[in-house]
Amino acid sequence: MIVDYAVMASDDNELYLDFWLPVSKLWKERIGVTPVLLYFGEGNPSEEYGIVVKMKSNKNLPLATCWARYWWAGQQEDKVTIISDIDMLPFSSWYLTEQVARFDNDKYIHINPCIDTYSRLPSCYHIASGYSYKKALQLHDNFQDSLDYLLSQRYDNSTCYIKGVGNDKWCYDEYHATELLLKYKDLIMVNRIGGQSGHRIDRTDWTYDIDKIKSGYYYDSHSIRPYKQNKDAIDKL
């Protein structure tokens, strides 16, 4: 299995969109994977390092941006896509691509399946071909049809929902994908060394060891935000 694309999504919210340029550069130049931004907005994000796919405006933001990543990946047929978050800085090509090279393209991989600590599969780090995404997640050909089906589901997301964030269906993308994938025979869960946030520089504890950066110890960083206010610290990293 060779990863072709890394897909992420955003609307015009600067809290997320501002990460596109630095994150796309990391995916392209450090990891060697083509980054794709599914953009629900009115501007023109840079395509210097990746592909921008303009999506129709949607009343169901931000859930639409979350689910769009699965849906777009499912349209890529024999191409392999890794789903990522736009504020997740990728550092390790071994963790993100090389360790899955041993698997056949008909498998569906998750490289951080922390159900024991997170209660579900995170949207970040699903890896599969378009055929596998479509089959495993029962994706429609039309994005709005696929989103409407997701919205028709009922999940207890009380542990996910945060007042003022998203809506009453926040995290439905993760609950729905998890429900379907746990029944899918070709799912392979590759445990992350150190658990859910192992080998990660996390915004909840923004400290790191420079020698470990140089040695390739860190897989990724869930970045501090917003980017503009923290640009110097993020760019230094």
Model region roles, listed by residue range:
Residues 1-58:
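N-terminal anchoring/stem segment of glycosyltransferases
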Residues 18-21, 25, 71, 171-179:
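A structural signal for well-ordered alpha-helical segments within the folded catalytic domains
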Residues 33-35, 81, 187-188:
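Hydrophobic anchor at the start of a short beta-strand
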Residues 85-89:
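The conserved acidic donor/metal-binding loop of glycosyltransferases
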Residues 90-122:
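Conserved donor-nucleotide/metal-binding helix-loop-beta segment in metal-dependent transferases, i.e.
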Residues 119-134:
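Short glycine- and hydrophobic/aromatic-rich loop-to-beta-strand nucleating segment
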Residues 131-237:
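Catalytic core and acceptor-binding pocket of nucleotide-sugar-dependent glycosyltransferases
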